[in-house]
């Protein structure tokens, strides 16, 4: 037993002496989840590829990995990554050499990295114009289009989006999604806008025939998308300083045109039909902002008819509120005639037009054919309807407005309230808004009272 104990101690002593010569650190080993990718032609991978790898170290642990892609190196502690490979301009395909070398906890790197040839193919970008972005066959001053550009290799690989008008040159518009608006003048020059911001002017509008807008995208490999094109459309330019916007039926608009003709006012006319969609743009903003900016005076006729928008139906006064505000801020002058309904008690129009609120009451307010709207400001004519006008809604003028008309209202079944039927607003010492809360076309008895009012507004007030 003693001999066995002495032998064990001797082994222990000699073993301790052996620590002066430690075992050398062994290099780690690196492996890719796949060791080869065999694809050709259209079966090649896209430029965005996700790869996985791992490392093993028999005498320690893995600290990270050295990744080399076509001689460009990086270090990571991750075991996977999505690579966005690039292809040189003008090339459709290429083979990417990728190596992964593990590094252990003592800084030793795998001397025989895992390697992989990645066959990739560039995907061409795609661009699409919203087909609802234009009127089907015509555009009044402004054509607005919405578009999207995508790329299966990643939208970030799109380097430019370009448009051209008819046979013109291709022009870059950036890659951020935007509404593009094009406004023509009588000479065929076109100002183009991005999200209502003016960019530049070009020539090339065809005011006699059809017009086309073309769009294409280019990726970082220099590959272009197929060209997308709007439907052909006829283009009408602004030809006067005054615009009539009629949101009532066309036969009523004929009355307004006759009155403006009698007043010798040159004007352009825009008929809007909520049922047929005639004259209604797919994108009210910025289309109408740009249309209005082409004029110095506007006459707006509307009522409680609702019109379609991208975000739902609404009244024309609300839809045009923002564009109207910008028009007025730039010095424009606006005449508005609108009949109201109880559903219009609130809305964006109250912030823009010279109206604080509408007057509603139980019962009914009406104007008879012997009622008179008496002017409260000098120079404005009195107004008398041809027939009984039901559903009259008076207004409370806004704090910065001046009452214009007082109505001799017949009050039925307990109706009670203010009887103001119009108001004006002044800017820089002169009237820039005239608002009447009534269907002006019926005020033509015994003479053309509505026409006299328009004559006074557009030839004396504005």
Residues covered by each model-derived region:
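Short, solvent-exposed loop/turn segments at the edges of extracellular beta-sandwich modules
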Residues: 103-109, 218-224
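Solvent-exposed loop/turn segments flanking beta-strands in beta-repeat/beta-sandwich domains
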Residues: 56-71, 150-173
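Hydrophobic/tyrosine-rich beta-strand signature of extracellular beta-sandwich/beta-rich modules
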Residues: 53, 96-102, 147, 211-217
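Extracellular ligand-binding/catalytic regions of CAZymes and related secreted enzymes
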Residues: 17-20, 418-420, 425-462
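Bacterial Sec-dependent N-terminal signal peptides
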Residues: 3, 8-39, 222-226, 462
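A glycine-rich, often tryptophan-bearing local segment used as a flexible ligand/cofactor-contacting loop or short
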Residues: 305-396, 400-405
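Surface-exposed, short loops/turns at beta-strand junctions within beta-sandwich domains
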Residues: 87-95, 202-210
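Helical hinge/lid and interdomain linker segments adjacent to catalytic or ligand-binding clefts
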Residues: 252-346
